Amino acid sequence: IERANQIAQTTELSANLAKGVKLIDARNKTDFAAGFIPGSINIQGNNAFATWAGWFLTYEEPFMIVASENQIEDLTRKLMRIGLDKVVGFVDNVTEWAAATGQQLETGKVISMDDLNELKQQNNLQLVDLRGAAEYNAGHIKGAEHVFVGTIEKNLDKVSKDRRVVILCQGGDRAAIAYSVLAKHGYHN
């Protein structure tokens, strides 16, 4: 873990990404949507961080984390408590990485309920509800497909690549995770 407490240099990050090392972006969903490294998964560094990381990481695979320097110790501790200790480094500035490599950051769009109501008027729209089964069964938007966020990678076949897709949950955190997973798998609709 001593090695993991170091901020990765641009070349180290690029080399790890080329080797397939997963990149977990722990920034808040708004900062993530404004610009993120392609292929990264947004799991916000809040109280649910370790829970969601446990759904998307295995105990064997190395990974890196995008986070501010003051979050590193806390996030590392949370992950170690559930056995995820293969952190190989941290990244604190995605903009510097993009500038140094010449690569473009991807962006996402956060929409409001008003935006959603407007989009629902379109025929070419798929709604994907990411909440748990009990939440979904207690009430959901008519026509929304249920795909629990923790299983989104195993259920990509349920998400259209041809239609416009709106993913939703209760507060947006799970939608940010699912958005990043979908973007990683080539969904840009």
Model region roles, listed by residue range:
Residues 1-2, 29-126, 130-189:
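Rhodanese-like catalytic fold shared by cysteine-dependent sulfurtransferases
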Residues 1-19, 24, 28-32:
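C-terminal accessory/connector segments of nucleic-acid motor ATPases
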